Amino acid sequence: MGAAESLIETFRARSDAADRTNEIDPDNYRDMQRIGITAAFVPKELGGFGLQSIHDWTLTIATLARGDGSAAIAISMHLSATRGLAALYHRSEPGSAPHTRAKQVLEAVARREMLICSTTTERGTDNLHPLTEATACEEGWRLNGTKNFVTMSPLATHVATNVRMRNEEGDYIANVLMPMDTEGVVQLGDWDALGMRASGSQSVQFDNCLIPQDALRTIGPWGGWSIPVLVNRTLANVPLVGAFLGIAETAMALAVEGRKRLRIRLRGRVWPMPSL
């Protein structure tokens, strides 16, 4: 939280221009990498802060949002992905394939080499029924579909997302982490909203993307809840409340300060403004 506190004024100074141009500000993310926020969940032995507290995660996002709500929401998506990888690292047998993959990614995050955007949202369906699908092929899997609200995607090096995967046993929800420069990944540049304009929450299309055989990790049945899906959804959404809190705190502070400077008088009295 101390690291986040140091960035409030810097973020605030940049936020107006980013909002007006509807562009994500790369300097904010370089700053968060530099002071270690992006590696908050990376275990200490791998070069990170070793964060485990969801309370501290939420307050960190609230603190960042006092400077720039877009940046706070965007980096929370990255932290959600790295939290999951840290959990996988801790619970996997050392030397096993999941442990090794998680370790490699977390070390790359600590070296400031990776920013991960995370998304599940698709038009016309819900999180339990992803329509983006991985189809088995000789080389591994072919991924096709479109995800919406892929926050921070203009700057991300990798994307983590849930997809539909079918095998001889049935249909599953599987998670995949893949480089954004994979052939067939298309950034649609369609983010133009009234709020969170600098979050880079565009849509991303996967057009016959080839991914390795071991890149998919099943996390539950397609169309049904499972513990991994429930945990991931809960822990991805709770810290976003922190962003809303930070935005509201700043709005309150600005309103109070503005009221102090305002002197609207009528017949010698201050005009009543109970809303402020």
Label the model's feature ranges.
Residues 1-45, 49-59, 241-276:
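Alpha-helical interface subdomain recognition
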Residues 26, 33, 40-147, 151:
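Glycine-rich flavin
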Residues 89-90, 137-138, 164-168, 180-183, ...:
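Short loop segments at secondary-structure junctions
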Residues 107-109, 151, 167-168, 194-197:
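A general structural signal for short secondary-structure junctions and capping/turn motifs
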Residues 114, 128-130, 155-157, 172, ...:
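A generic structural signal for well-ordered coil/turn residues at beta-strand boundaries
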Residues 138-142, 158, 201:
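A generic structural signal for beta-strand entry/edge sites
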Residues 146-187:
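A short core secondary-structure module
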Residues 193-276:
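Glycine-rich beta->alpha junctions and the first turn(s) of the following alpha-helix
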